[in-house]
Structure formats: structure tokens, C-alpha cells
A protein has these predicted regions:
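Short, small/polar-rich motifs associated with maturation and membrane association
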Residues: 1-342, 354-356, 427, 462
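Residue-level recognition of beta-strand termini and adjacent short loop/turns
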Residues: 69, 89, 350, 434-436, ...
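Membrane-embedded beta-strand positions in outer-membrane beta-barrel channels/transporters
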Residues: 94, 141, 165, 223-225, ...
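Residues on the lipid-exposed face of transmembrane beta-strands in outer-membrane beta-barrel proteins
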Residues: 228, 241, 258, 305-309, ...
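Surface-exposed loop/interface segments of Gram-negative outer-membrane beta-barrel transport/assembly proteins
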Residues: 233-286, 328-334, 340-424, 444, ...
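Transmembrane beta-strand segments that form the barrel wall of outer-membrane beta-barrel proteins
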Residues: 243, 322-326, 596-605, 647
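Long hydrophobic segments that form regular secondary structure
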Residues: 437, 693-719
């Protein structure tokens, strides 16, 4: 009875208020369309500030809503920027929405969780797959060049498959400045990025400021989070094939002297020095264009095939690719090729338990030439004088005899043999249990294994009299004699160096994610977990001399004909490192416009001395979504405005393993009873107090979106 009376009273009160308001309201009509093509848009039109009065458009984009003159309206549609406007008359409205350039509700992967762009309080940048695939690039990290503010990609090598250096907000240390790179949660180094097919990348998220402290002792140089493409539920399987074939050429060459210009200039120099002119006839024409001889057109091609789809419980994304690239210097002697296979699976084992699996296999082969600096092919190319031919009349390569440290670059390429092969296996097994609507427990095991085989062959070569690069004593390719000890000499012929190295990473992580909204105004998120990381590397290398027939075809250490094997040798290495971590993060949002986040991580690393192994890395950040304020007045021009601030402490553990231990170095070789015996000496003292570098970073940022078309991000930071 009491319920009925209460309902009757509310109904009576509502009816009375409606009757009073009806005298002051108008029936406003209008249509919402796409600004680009004027097609109808299904949208929600609500009255501000509280939005309790709202309506939706029909399939033609039309709506009708009871409003009052002076009311402010908010028009929202999925995939479009919102629009605010004021009611000034009863005339029908024509509202055009612009497609979102940046969807503020888009989910972005962060450390051990995810967030929407609107909720993020740190300085981050995201590159999507659409921006990557249109670039036709061989390496994933090249997608960041010019795409992300504060990120600089330095090319260490211009040859195919060459490495790059990624720098986020400049240099942080005199040591290793490489950022932490995670692909689907698996740790990669910058060299390992060669294994990825850029067409498989779904997104790249760059963490630039102190909020990267969730990754603790490895986050001082920034963090790059890469997600590969995954299957989507619903719909038929989708097959994609992408291919391109290209030709590469040098865009610009140096303006060097031709033969006649060189002869005239050199004659004048000798004349001014009171010496006889070296060229009796300077009418030599163009002569040899060494750049034209060395630089050539190089082919590159890429093919990739992928299938994406789902069944009742499983989504999948499967892909394979092939990429090859010749060098514009050296052709197939400077080549890179890559075969890649990838499988991403996500299976709902129960309604609350999900298994995510990632498998990646890559085979790479790379051939290289001497590069970067004195003695490289390009150094010899630009310093070779144009008055000398490529090949003499007797068929041998010209010696370039006038300068002792310059050799014929064509001969250099012909006698260079340097080949490396890599097999890489990467995977992740992740089990996510949805405990309830607010709590998820994730456990994952990652592995990253690489097998590297390399071979370098050094034949007997004669580049000309006085050349330091000669490995033979004369043009007849006679081998030099090497004195190992007094009265003990051996012939040193062509040599080969071979090595096999293995590297393996294992990671186990377990963490809880809590996400709950209290009432309409309070949103709380929290993460807590632990991580165990171990890395091991080992390798064995050997070199051998006197390879038969001075030929690459026989370049194997087993074929060595060195007398007694004295010239031959071997080397090895081994290292192991471990990292134990505990981490936590708490986030709070009030009315989705006042945001605050705190991070705390504790790391223990085996790289540091026993007195300084553990460190604590905190961070705090906050944001204010100004455009969500009821009194915000610039909505028609600046659709979105957010002010951010953050401060965090991160560490850097990029130092050699065992650096805190004493080191013995090999010193000298001595003959004892006709046996050659190496000596040792202390090369480095121990340091049990060796610890990580610490970086403190403060950041103040502003995010703006103007007229749903122009996105502006401003950051001011101090990093020390």
C-alpha cells in the first residue's frame, strides 16, 4: 500500500511539473549527418548539463526533443567527435559531425593493463596499424620515425637488415640508452625487431614519462609496447595478402672531381710546392666514376599472407611473410632476407577462463660489407682517384698505388665474405581468470629464444704495394710467415671464423587487475603483481687458418691445414641474469574528469653488487579533463582539452653482466718446454656496491582536439 501511494505521489508530481514546463518548452527537430559525405548518422542528443533529457536519432539521422530556448545540447555518435550547441530558436537544426581522428574511448595497452586515451595521465603516443602498413618499411622501428614526438631513430647501418638506435627524449646515460621493448608482453632488444613483420603490428604505444616506472629498473630510457594483430569474434574468416616489389637507388651522390679536374688540381698543387707535375697530359676526360661503379639499383620485395577469424570459443590470427632486400652497395653481398610465421590464439576455456597464446618463428639471413668509417667500402669509394681504372689491362683490379690507406672498393667487395643466420622462437602462454565483474587474475609465461650462426672468411688478398689491408705478401698471393716465439714461425694462410651463440629469455608474471565504478561518479582501478625474469646467453667461436684453395667454398674450421693447429683458436662466453619484481598501481577517476594514478615497483637485479641489488621506483600522475566541465565554453572550437602532470623515478640496469666482480684478463703468451702458454692478470677489481642508475622525470602536458580534426599534444619535461 505504501509503495502504491509513493508511486502515485511521484506520478502526480511529475505530471504537475510537466504541465508547468510545457508552457516554456518547444519541440525541437533536426537531422544529424556525416560532415564529409552528408550521410545520416545515428546519434544521441541530450540536454546539458545533466543530460537527463535525451533522445536518439532514427535511421535517417532525424530527431525530435523537448527543449527550452537557451538550453545547451550535446550530440554524440560512435566513431564521431561530439558537438555542443545552444538552442536559439525553434528552427530545425542541421548538425554535421566529423569522424573522430582520435577516439578517446579507444583502449590503449599500458603496463600490466589497459586504459582509454581519455583516462591516460601520462605522456604516451600511439601508432596504429593503418599508419604502419602504408609505409612499406622493412623494420618495425622505422614506423616511429617522424610519427612520434620525442622519439629519434638513428640508423647505425644503411645496409639491409642493419640495426637502429631508438632514443626517447634524448640521452639518459653515458651507457646504454636503448628503451625497454615489449612485444605482446615479451621482452625484445632493438636487434630483435628485425624478426617482426611490420604488417603484423596492431599498435605501438610509447611511454615517455615517469609513468613508465611500472617497469622499474629497466624503464629509465622509456618503454615501447607493441601489440600484434589478433582475431575478432563474429563474422566469416578474413584473408589478406599484401605484396610489393621495389627498386632502390641512391637519392643523392657526392659531387666529386672527374679525371681532368683531379689532374689539373693535383698538377697545380705540385707546382705550387716546387715539385714536378705528375700529369703530363691533363686532358683525361671523365675518367672513372667510382660512385657509379659501386652504387647500383637494388631490388626489394615483400609478401605476406594472413587469416583472421573465430569459432565459437576461439579467435585466431595466423600469418606468414617473406622479405628480401639487396644492398645498393654490394648487391647480393649485402643482402637481408627474412621468413616469418605467426600464430595468435585466444580461447574461452570457460565463461570465466581465457587462454591467450602467441607463437612467432623467424629465420633471417644477412650478408654484410665493411661499413662506417675508415676502411669501409664507401670510404674507399669517395677517396679513390678518378684517374685510375677499375681493372687493369691484365685483368687484375687496379692498386690505387699513390695512397697507402685507400684500396680498390670493387676488389674489397669481391673479397669480403661475412654471413650471419638467425633462428628466433618467441611465444607467450597467458591464462586470464575473470574472478568476478571487477577482478581479473592473469598469469603468463613468456619465452624468447634465438640461435645465431655466423661465418667470416678472410682470403689471401693483394690490394697493392704498401696496403695495410693486404693479407698476402705479394700479387702471387703467397702467405706471410708469422713468428709465434723465438725460433718458431708458421705460414698464415686464408682464415675463417665461425661462431654459434644462443640467447634465451624466460619470464613469469602473475598479477591482479581490479576495475569498478561506484555510483555514477567514482571509478577505481588497481593492479598488483609479481614478475620473475631470467636471461641466459652462451656462445662458442673458433678461428682456423690455411683454408684450402683460398676459397669460400672450403671456409670451415674443420678444413684447416695449419701446421699443428697452433694458429687456430677458440673462444666462448656465458652469462646469466635474473630480475625479481613486485609492482602495484592504483587509479581513481571522479566524474571521468579528475584523474589520479600512483605506481610503485620494487626490483632486485643480479647485475648489481650484493650490497645494492634492490631498488624502489615510484611514480604519481594526474589529469584534468577540462572539456568535461559544465562551465566549459569553447566546445564548438576545442572539442577536447586535458591537462596532465606526472613525476616518476625509474632505473637503468643496462650494464654488462658480472660487472661488480673481479676480472682476470689474458696477458701475453710465453713458450715453456716448447709449449705456448698464455698468462693472466687482474684486469678489474670487484665492486660490491655497484648499483643501477636512477632517472627522475617530471612532465606537464596538454592534449587538445580542435574542431574534431586537429589534434595537438604539448609536453614540457625535465629529465635528470
Amino acid at each position: 500500500m505504501r509503495t502504491f501511494l509513493r508511486f502515485s505521489f511521484v506520478l502526480l508530481l511529475t505530471t504537475s511539473l510537466s504541465g508547468i514546463a510545457s508552457a516554456q518548452t518547444i519541440a525541437l527537430t533536426g537531422q544529424v549527418t556525416d560532415r564529409s559525405d552528408r550521410s545520416p548518422v545515428q546519434a544521441i542528443v541530450s540536454v546539458l548539463p545533466n543530460g537527463t533529457s535525451k533522445t536518439g536519432t532514427d535511421f535517417q539521422g532525424r530527431f525530435s526533443l523537448e527543449v527550452r530556448i537557451g538550453d545547451s545540447l550535446l550530440v554524440e555518435a560512435f566513431g564521431y567527435g561530439s558537438k555542443r550547441l545552444k538552442v536559439t530558436s525553434s528552427q530545425p537544426l542541421a548538425i554535421a559531425l566529423a569522424p573522430n581522428q582520435v577516439d578517446l574511448g579507444e583502449v590503449v595497452v599500458t603496463g600490466y593493463g589497459s586504459s582509454t586515451k581519455k583516462e591516460m595521465t601520462g605522456a604516451t603516443s600511439v601508432v596504429k596499424s593503418e599508419e604502419i602498413t602504408k609505409l612499406n618499411i622493412p623494420r618495425m622501428d622505422q614506423a616511429l620515425q617522424g610519427q612520434v614526438a620525442g622519439v629519434v631513430i638513428n640508423t647505425n647501418s644503411g645496409s639491409p637488415g642493419g640495426s637502429t638506435s631508438i632514443r626517447i627524449r634524448g640521452l639518459s646515460t653515458f651507457g646504454d640508452n636503448d628503451p625497454l621493448i615489449l612485444v605482446d608482453g615479451v621482452v625484445y632488444d632493438s636487434e630483435g625487431l628485425n624478426a617482426l613483420n611490420p604488417n603484423d603490428i596492431a599498435s605501438i604505444n610509447v611511454l615517455k614519462d615517469g609513468t613508465a616506472s611500472i617497469f622499474g629498473v629497466r624503464a629509465a630510457n622509456g618503454v615501447i609496447l607493441i601489440e600484434t594483430k589478433k582475431g575478432q569474434k563474429g563474422g566469416a574468416p578474413v584473408f589478406e595478402y599484401a605484396s610489393y616489389l621495389g627498386v632502390q637507388q641512391t637519392a643523392k651522390r657526392l659531387g666529386l672531381l672527374n679525371a681532368q679536374e683531379y689532374a689539373v688540381l693535383k698538377n697545380n698543387a705540385f707546382l705550387n710546392g716546387g715539385q714536378d707535375q705528375p700529369f703530363a697530359n691533363t686532358a683525361l676526360g671523365v675518367g672513372t666514376d667510382w660512385q657509379d661503379a659501386v652504387f647500383q639499383s637494388a631490388m626489394t620485395s615483400s609478401h605476406s599472407l594472413s587469416a583472421t577469424g573465430s569459432s565459437n570459443q576461439t579467435t585466431y590470427s595466423i600469418g606468414g611473410s617473406y622479405f628480401t632486400q639487396d644492398g645498393i652497395v654490394g648487391g647480393d653481398k649485402s643482402n637481408f632476407s627474412r621468413y616469418n610465421g605467426r600464430v595468435n590464439l585466444s580461447t574461452d576455456m570457460t565463461s570465466r577462463l581465457r587462454l591467450n597464446s602467441v607463437f612467432l618463428f623467424t629465420h633471417e639471413e644477412r650478408k654484410t660489407l665493411p661499413e662506417n668509417g675508415i676502411g669501409s667500402v664507401l670510404f674507399n669509394t669517395i677517396n679513390a682517384y678518378p684517374t685510375e681504372p677499375l681493372v687493369e689491362e691484365d685483368g687484375r683490379y687496379s692498386y690505387l698505388a699513390l695512397v697507402s690507406d685507400i684500396i680498390n672498393p670493387i676488389a674489397q667487395m669481391a673479397n669480403t665474405y661475412n654471413q650471419t643466420g638467425v633462428n628466433k622462437f618467441v611465444g607467450k602462454e597467458e591464462l586470464a581468470w575473470t574472478v568476478n565483474e571487477s577482478l581479473t587474475w592473469t598469469n603468463r609465461f613468456n619465452y624468447n629464444y634465438a640461435l645465431v650462426d655466423g661465418r667470416v672468411f678472410s682470403p689471401l688478398v693483394w690490394y697493392g704495394p704498401g696496403k695495410a689491408q693486404n693479407t698476402a705478401v705479394n700479387a702471387d698471393l703467397d702467405a706471410p710467415m708469422v713468428t709465434l716465439a723465438e725460433g718458431f714461425s708458421l705460414e698464415r694462410g686464408p682464415s675463417v671464423y665461425q661462431h654459434r651463440d644462443t640467447y634465451g629469455d624466460l619470464t613469469f608474471e602473475s598479477y591482479l587487475n581490479y576495475d569498478r565504478t561506484f555510483g555514477e561518479d567514482h571509478h577505481v582501478k588497481a593492479t598488483a603483481g609479481t614478475s620473475v625474469f631470467t636471461r641466459q646467453g652462451k656462445g662458442l667461436g673458433a678461428w682456423a687458418f690455411n683454408i684450402p684453395n683460398n676459397s669460400w667454398d672450403y671456409a670451415d674450421i674443420s678444413a684447416s691445414q695449419a701446421a699443428g693447429g697452433y694458429l687456430n683458436g677458440a673462444s666462448s662466453f656465458f652469462f646469466e641474469e635474473r630480475l625479481l619484481s613486485a609492482f602495484g598501481r592504483a587509479e581513481y577517476a571522479y566524474k571521468s574528469r579528475y584523474l589520479v594514478s600512483g605506481v610503485l615497483r620494487r626490483d632486485g637485479s643480479s647485475k648489481f653488487g650484493p650490497n645494492a641489488r634492490w631498488g624502489i621506483f615510484p611514480a604519481i600522475s594526474g589529469a584534468w579533463v577540462i572539456s568535461d566541465e559544465p562551465a566549459y565554453r569553447w566546445a564548438q572550437t576545442i572539442d577536447f582539452a586535458k591537462l596532465r602532470a606526472s613525476f616518476g623515478v625509474a632505473g637503468n640496469d643496462q650494464i654488462p653482466n658480472f660487472a661488480y666482480r673481479a676480472l682476470l684478463n689474458g696477458e701475453g703468451v710465453y713458450p715453456f718446454n716448447d709449449l705456448l702458454t698464455p698468462g693472466v692478470a687482474i684486469g678489474r677489481a670487484s665492486n660490491p656496491d655497484l648499483k643501477w642508475e636512477t632517472t627522475r622525470q617530471a612532465n606537464l602536458g596538454l592534449d587538445l582536439r580542435i574542431r574534431n580534426a586537429l589534434n595537438i599534444t604539448l609536453n614540457a619535461f625535465e629529465k635528470r
